[in-house]
């Protein structure tokens, strides 16, 4: 899912996304700070064909809503995690791989986090997913916050656009209280 609210650049305070017909509808709640472009890309799971909706709140309190239809064969939310079938996945839990790509007015961060993102819909496997993320500068100031929900794919891939040449780190927490950090 790629969301681009750059038409409202400088005014975006919050972006919400959900999949109407998914068993777990919420996808993310993104709050970009002034040093981030109002863009976000993230891989998600879809159970069946569904409308995807995004609501963008601007400083004036207005919500701007857009949508698209996603066609899917189905089963994405109720399929067991491929990650759990891989030997040693626990040792890689929370590892972040990523790269920074130069752009005209800053850079794009593209990250992948090792995590099964279990949504609790597979028998015998409880919810276990990343639910909080913050992009911070080297001083620890929050540049953006991101609340994630179990509709996000396992080993989630996230792309963010940062203004300027800010050195950053990613902080993550899952619903079991595990915390992870990566310098980017």
Name each region found by the language model.
Residues 4-7, 112-126:
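Short amphipathic, basic-aromatic surface patches that mediate peripheral association
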Residues 14-18, 132-136, 171:
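Beta-strand signatures of extracellular beta-sandwich domains
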Residues 33-40, 150-161:
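Aromatic sugar-binding surface patches on proteins
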Residues 38-43, 51-55:
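Ligand-binding face of N-terminal immunoglobulin V-set domains in extracellular IgSF glycoproteins
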Residues 43-49, 161-166:
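Surface-exposed, short loops/turns at beta-strand junctions within beta-sandwich domains
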Residues 58-66, 173-182:
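Short acidic/polar inter-strand loop motif in beta-rich domains
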Residues 69-75, 184:
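Short beta-strand edge segments in extracellular beta-sheet folds
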Residues 74-98, 104:
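Low-complexity, Pro/Ser/Thr- and charge-rich linker/hinge segments at domain boundaries
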């Amino acid at each position: 899912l790629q969301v681009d609210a750059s038409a409202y650049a400088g005014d975006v305070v919050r972006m919400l996304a959900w999949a109407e017909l998914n068993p777990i509808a919420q996808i993310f709640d993104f709050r970009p700070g002034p040093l981030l472009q109002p863009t976000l890309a993230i891989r998600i799971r879809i159970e069946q064909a569904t409308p995807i909706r995004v609501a963008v709140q601007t400083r004036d309190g207005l919500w701007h809503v857009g949508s698209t239809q996603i066609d899917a064969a189905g089963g994405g939310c109720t399929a067991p995690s491929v990650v759990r079938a891989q030997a040693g996945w626990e040792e890689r839990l929370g590892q972040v791989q990523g790269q920074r790509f130069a752009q005209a007015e800053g850079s794009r961060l593209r990250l992948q986090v090792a995590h099964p993102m279990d949504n609790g819909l597979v028998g015998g496997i409880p919810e276990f997913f990343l639910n909080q993320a913050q992009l911070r500068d080297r001083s620890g100031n929050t540049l953006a916050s991101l609340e994630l929900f179990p509709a996000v794919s396992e080993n989630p891939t996230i792309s963010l656009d940062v203004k300027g040449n800010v050195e950053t780190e990613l902080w993550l927490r899952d619903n079991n209280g595990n915390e992870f950090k990566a310098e980017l």
